[in-house]
Amino acid sequence: MKFYFPVHLDGGNRGCEAIAKSTAILLNQPKENIIGLCTDIPTDNKLGLNQCVTLRHVELPLYQRVINRLSRYLHLDSLRRSIYDYFLKPMKKEDIMISTGGDMMCYGNNFVIETNDIATRKGCKTVLWGCSMAASNLTPEKEKTLRKFDI
């Protein structure tokens, strides 16, 4: 079983970094079993996150970036893919996705919904961990995704 942290992103946000790092320590698993999406590996290495999390940087292949631009222009959203699709692709049913990060639900409908949808489609367990949100920012889409989380 592996644990995926798709919304940590990088240590530039110290709250997200602290939640990801402390969660990894609490899981008490080899770092190879804890995979974190990262946009700034040097910063996370400097902060020591690489000691307890396997950091993975994901970039969309050129062909997918072209398809994404065309799909936006032609309004064909079903063809669009994100870094989250590629990051979560290796997930197996026995794996767990942990959405870490303080204020990630305080902004419009975002990647938390997308990552939860991807993991749920794969039959994986999902955990919402260390998150705040304001009632004024609660949308129907967020309510739906909150109900999908297993924990």
Predicted regions span which residues?
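A short beta-strand/loop micro-motif in the catalytic core of glycosyltransferases
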Residues: D150-I151
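Aromatic- and Gly/Pro-rich donor/ligand-binding loops
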Residues: M1-N137, E141, T145
